[in-house]
Every structure is written in C-alpha cells, then in structure tokens.
A protein has these predicted regions:
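Short, well-ordered alpha-helical microsegments
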Residues: 46-47, 75-78, 97, 130, ...
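Short, exposed beta-strand/loop patches in secreted or surface proteins that constitute
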Residues: 1-5, 28, 113
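Hydrophobic, well-structured mid-protein blocks that either form specific transmembrane helices
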Residues: 75-124
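Short, well-ordered beta-strand micro-motif
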Residues: 12, 28-30, 134-136
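Short hydrophobic/charged patches on amphipathic alpha-helices used for structural packing
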Residues: 26, 51, 55, 176-177
C-alpha cells in the first residue's frame, strides 16, 4: 500500500487488486459534506493500519461517509465502507443494478446534472454505465477505466476492446472532450501512475486520434 497526500484534504492510496493482479488507485477527499471515497479498496496488507487511519479521519470530519463509484467493476470495498461507517453508496443510474449486485445496495443512483457530495461532478462517457468525476476544489479528474496511465507520465484512453460493441475510440474521445473545458490540473487514474501536474495537456494528448 502506497499513500500519497496530493493536496490539503486530497489523498490517493493504492491497494493490490487480486482480479487485476496489480495495484490500483483509490481517492480520499475531505469535503463540507463529509468524507468522500472514490472507488475505495481496502488493502490486503497493512489492513489494520489502514482502518485505524481511516477511522481517525472519519471521526475528525464528524460527518457522513460517501462512496462514489465510477463504474460497477470498481465497486471494490464499497460494501465494507457501508457496513463500517453506514456510508452512502453513489453510482450512475445506468450502472445501478450491476453495482448493487456487488455491494448489496446503491443508496444514491444519480443521473446527469444531479448534485453530488462536496460539489463533485459526474461526467458521462461513451461507456453508459461509467462516469468520470470532477473534483473542482482540487482541479482533479478521477476516471475509472476510460482513462489509464500511459506509462510515460501521461494518460491514454482505454483499449477499444473495453468499449461497447457499438462504440469506437472516436466516440469515447468525443464523450470526454467536454472535460477539456475544465481547468484540469490532475488526472487521478485508477490504473497506473496519476498525473499530478499538467493534467489538461495530458488529457488533450490522450484524446488525440
């Protein structure tokens, strides 16, 4: 488990994902509406240390815990967060049933333009059941699977094989292009190394075809 403080109130940690057989990234955000966890996964090493730190932070914030899921494949430890903190589980309405099969419940299914905790926004993608979160307070994008690290310090779109049969990389790029209008500084990918500076440029390069 690696833990990185990116900004005041914004952290990213990694945990080993047994199905992927690799480390994946998860995001912790402190907001006025409580603690927000995006695609959280409890590490299978240093587990007690992880829970102790998170318990402390949740207690310090004195507010509810919200779990935001980008895509049903990233339900991960959402059910454990609900059991431990009575967390609200948020997910895109198009993926509600698939998320619920993995978590037991989706307390808050949202659609386009719905208000999310802490002023976080959800942006649609060419994968109907997946969103990209925008955390304006930290100028950070948090994608699930549609954007990945490119291994060179930047980002890239997911492989075409990950898209629905009716969609192409051009469709994915078009769905993500509105994100270029945001003042993106960071792209906190789940798979690979996050982009911590120059996120807007990295995003623009990722969408070039």
């Amino acid at each position: 488990m690696d833990v990185l403080e990116i900004d005041d109130g914004l952290w990213r940690w990694t945990a080993f994902h047994e199905e992927w057989n690799e480390q994946v990234g998860c995001v912790y955000v402190e907001t006025e509406d409580g603690v927000v966890l995006i695609d959280p996964l409890v590490p299978n090493e240093d587990t007690a240390k992880f829970w102790k730190a998170l318990d402390r932070d949740v207690k310090k914030r004195k507010g509810p815990v919200h779990v935001l899921i980008t895509v049903f494949w990233h339900a991960r430890s959402a059910a454990e967060m609900r059991e431990r903190y009575d967390a609200r589980i948020w997910g895109p309405s198009a993926g509600k049933a698939a998320i619920a099969r993995r978590t037991g419940v989706v307390t808050d299914a949202f659609g386009p333009d719905d208000e999310l905790p802490g002023g976080i926004e959800a942006h649609r993608t060419a994968r109907a059941a997946e969103v990209v979160y925008w955390v304006p307070e930290h100028s950070a994008l948090v994608p699930g699977d549609v954007l990945l690290a490119d291994g060179k310090g930047g980002a890239r779109m997911c492989p075409e094989s990950w898209l629905p049969a009716s969609k192409t990389p051009r469709d994915l790029a078009a769905s993500l292009r509105p994100l270029l209008d945001l003042p993106v500084r960071r792209v906190l990918v789940s798979h690979g190394r996050p982009v911590l500076t120059g996120g807007g440029r990295a995003l623009a390069r990722a969408l070039e075809l």
